[in-house]
């Protein structure tokens, strides 16, 4: 049962996230030979000011 977690800065529309989830599901199903009904995609909208690579605030 594949679980796919995607972290994105917030700002994408619901339509964009829906399309992303559908496309990711298709690819995972094809490559991992997993039934689509067993694939779970989680999209996390990260607010600006919450990402610190190498300890430094990263902005969009």
UniProtKB/Swiss-Prot annotation:
> Per the record's keyword annotation, is Isomerase included, yes or no?
yes
Quote the EC number. Answer: 5.3.2.-
Tell me which residues this entry annotates as catalytic: 2
Cite the entry's keywords alphabetically. Answer: Isomerase
| Source organism superkingdom | Bacteria
In alphabetical order, the GO MF annotations are: isomerase activity
Q: What family classification does the UniProt entry report for this protein? A: Belongs to the 4-oxalocrotonate tautomerase family.
Please give the PANTHER family that the UniProt record associates with this protein.
2-HYDROXYMUCONATE TAUTOMERASE, TAUTOMERASE-RELATED
Name of the protein this chain belongs to: Probable tautomerase SAG1079
Supply the source organism for this entry.
Streptococcus agalactiae serotype V (strain ATCC BAA-611 / 2603 V/R)
